[in-house]
A protein has these predicted regions:
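DNA major-groove recognition helix of helix-turn-helix/homeodomain DNA-binding modules
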Residues: 22, 41-56
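Recognition helix of helix-turn-helix/homeodomain-like DNA-binding domains
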Residues: 22-37
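DNA major-groove recognition helix of helix-turn-helix
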Residues: 32, 50, 58-61
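Short basic helix-loop element that most often maps to the first helix and adjoining turn
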Residues: 2-20
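Short, charged recognition helix plus adjacent turn
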Residues: 9, 58-68
């Protein structure tokens, strides 16, 4: 998942992103390390926040806006 890359591009900490998504810093950390997968609702929130498609977020495409 491209979550860490997108977060760093916005110069955000895990905690600040967690607060924006109404989740915990631990959840963001687990998503970034692949130890936990976000549910569909959370995937949509993340994709909308970064203005990218879910396919881009999940590395299924290199086009950030595809199928958005």
């Amino acid at each position: 998942m491209r979550l860490k890359l997108l977060r760093k591009q916005k110069h955000m900490s895990q905690l600040s992103l967690a607060m924006k998504l109404n989740t915990t810093q631990m959840s963001i950390s687990l998503y970034e390390t692949g130890k936990r997968e976000p549910d569909l609702k959370t995937l949509i929130l993340i994709a909308d926040f970064f203005d990218v498609s879910i396919d881009y977020l999940l590395e299924r495409t290199d086009n950030p806006k595809m199928n958005k």
